[in-house]
Amino acid sequence: MSSFVADKIVMDGLTYDDVLLIPAYSEVLPKQVELKTKFSRNIELNVPFVTAAMDTVTEASMAIAIAREGGIGVIHKNMTIEEQARQVAIVKRAENGMIYDPVTIRRGSTVKDALDMMHDYHIGGIPVVDDENHLVGIVTNRDLRFERHMDKKIDEVMTSENLVTTHIQTDLVAAASILQENKIEKLPVVDNENRLVGLITYKDITKAKDKPMACKDAKGRLRVAAGVGVTVDTLDRAKALVEAGADAIVIDTAHGHSKGVVEKLKQVKAAFPQVDVVVGNVATGEAAKYLVENGADGVKVGIGPGSICTTRVVAGVGVPQLSAVYDVYSALKGTGVPLIADGGLRYSGDVVKALAAGGSCVMIGSLVAGTEESPGDTIIFNGRKFKSYRGMGSLEAMEQKNGSKDRYFQGDTKDAKKLVPEGIAGRVPYKGTVQEVIYQLIGGLRSGMGYCGAATIENLHNAKFARITNAGVLESHPHDITITS
């Protein structure tokens, strides 16, 4: 037995419940700490939260909500290429400093065409242009609200006289004044020849004021990432996502330390060198270094820690999450490549521990599953509200036409009975809005950083841990009382 331990046991594996952070001298209050961090080599977040690329967690609504709070969402890939690209486009159009490629409608189109476009793009107004992109009018939902004749030409209902416009040099402060003075909500931006080059909306200006911490690109649009797999259509999917405006591509697999994943990484980086590519999942420093050496701009860490993941019991494989995060952090020091701690987080205290162990940010699934913005309908069960939540390795998720079986290297399996699930499906209590959940998580994170004397997440990496026993875990939670509130 001793030789087995000496030869085969190479590390002790610890997870979040095995440790507590040791309080340290502090000169910062929780409200003073800085939460800025990185998602990938070139993408900065204002809070260290990333929503998971899961079909019961992140679609456009979730990605918009988390970006407004300062994080970023990863749109899942359990859908057609066209639908995933559409989801990305919805996020990129949700807010803008100035919309540089506004949705337009051609002169001669019908009321039905305009209504369809408003529905598809979730917008309330469309500039009308001629064949040479000259602005000839604008049509809004107010113009169409009581219109019964769907085949009527847009020219007959649009506003074309006394159209208020501005030029490309106008900043948002000046634009806000123009909108207010003229009591309008949309301000077309034109060049010297009256060609449409952009659109500024009152709603976008208001949102920018209401959410100053929102995670945005250089054009004032919300940031969003999107997942791809290791399949024959990886490059086609990545191309569509990049064209739709995705800020990062996430190559999402169960085992990132593999030949096929690295080959896809090289192909995606070669095709789209301007876009950051995050790769996962891995659980060792060796794996992370291998990915970074081959071009990864971010590394996702976690094999089997998620609440809906069964990889560790089905395959017997994994590394307890705290140890995995620290091993990868140690390996990536000095590379400038961030690591994302993915999975195993149940409390805000776990977030603090994950970041203290070396995480740049955390990926959350169960913590935001069940929110208003997560995909799926709210169901009533025994008088309480729930929403569905499932692992991408669950049989449900893998059975779909555009399912996730390739994530678990079972893409060629045609018969559902031959699939080997590495996840489960279930339901979680309804949690309210993402804003409410993130507010509580940020509060716990700020408090933990204050206790550790860490003014920044980078400072938090210097915090020390105490290993605790099962008795310590019990002592850490409320005990010897009936909780009433």
Spans of model-derived segments:
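Alpha/beta catalytic cores of nucleotide-metabolism and tRNA/nucleoside-modifying enzymes
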Residues: 1-25, 105-106, 167, 227, ...
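Active-site-adjacent beta->alpha loops and helix N-cap segments on the catalytic face
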Residues: 31, 80-89, 147-151, 195-215, ...
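Bateman/CBS regulatory modules and CBS-like beta-alpha motifs in cytosolic regions of diverse proteins
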Residues: 31-46, 52-54, 83-121, 128-130, ...
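Short beta-strand/loop segments at the ligand-binding rim of alpha/beta enzyme cores
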Residues: 44-51, 97-102, 161, 217-227, ...
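Catalytic cores of alpha/beta
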Residues: 61-64, 236-244, 277, 283-301, ...
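Glycine-rich phosphate-binding active-site loops on the catalytic face of alpha/beta enzymes
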Residues: 68-83, 246-258, 297-315, 345-379
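Catalytic beta/alpha-barrel core
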Residues: 74-78, 104-105, 125-127, 165-166, ...
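Terminal amphipathic helices with adjacent charged low-complexity linkers/tails
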Residues: 77-91, 128, 132-148, 179, ...
